[in-house]
Amino acid sequence: MSFSSVPTLRGVQEVLSVSNDVAAELAGVGDGVLDSLRDRLGCTLLLRGNRLTIEGDEPHVSEARAVVGELVDLVESGHEIGPGTVDTVFGALEQSEDVRRVLDDVVWRHRGKAIAPKTVTQKRYVDAIRSSTVTFGIGPAGTGKTYLAMALAVASLSDREVGRIILTRPAVEAGERLGFLPGDMLAKVDPYLRPLFDALYDMLDPDKLTTYMERGTIEVAPLAFMRGRTLNDSFIILDEAQNTSPEQMQMFLTRLGFGSKVVVTGDVTQIDLPREQASGLIQVRDILGSTEGLSFVSFTNQDVVRHKLVQRIVEAY
């Protein structure tokens, strides 16, 4: 791959000729990839046929050359790209990370869908979960903390590295307590646990998930149900951990048994506890930050992988 360069009144113009297949990927559906590039780069990009023209001042053109070069390499190595890939490439280049090392780490596949890190921080998070007994993923909504942890849990179960998966959340959010909610226990906890079920349905066939649930191979339950237990040979995920008290956090972490792995996720900007109640997720880093076998991974709004508007909302708040 090589660019031809010509000086212009605006600075420099570079032209890259690519195959028709690569050109189609660089455009994207509805020009989505090209529009993402234009949004991120301070120069003009024009794709006509199989020729991509970049024009602007030298620093911006140089940045565009690097980003486009990475995208072309990804396409030629068999990757499908989209607007999100543009963000991944920018993040990797900014942090001197190998783009393929991030995108090629497929955590789980289901029905042809590959679940893999999309940002450098997500890749570090995946690596931390694999190498540590207890991992904390802390950051805004939409950064893939829980989803990636669940994909790793399903993969570990499939590979027989663990015998069961346990998913839990505090059942106290937005001022609601179980005792004051209508209905039986299942009806009471369902609204709190539904997001975890939604993710599981993305990763497993419904029949297999039902079988796992009936056998207790996968358990989804409120945090209160963990008290008094020792959880061996398990992959345990505590979601929405910002809504635990310090006492609940200690109780949960001491459930860890032999052959188990724990992931704790949460967003300390979305605490629903009473104002006078301390968050266990905020305190735990000060208490356990230097403890061997534990990892802490912090996400930022740059790691939000949902709709672009979600990232803007996170930034605004």
Locations of regions flagged by a protein language model:
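Interdomain "pre-motor" coupling segment immediately N-terminal to P-loop NTPase/helicase cores
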Residues: 46-102
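Accessory nucleic-acid engagement/destabilization modules that flank
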Residues: 1-4
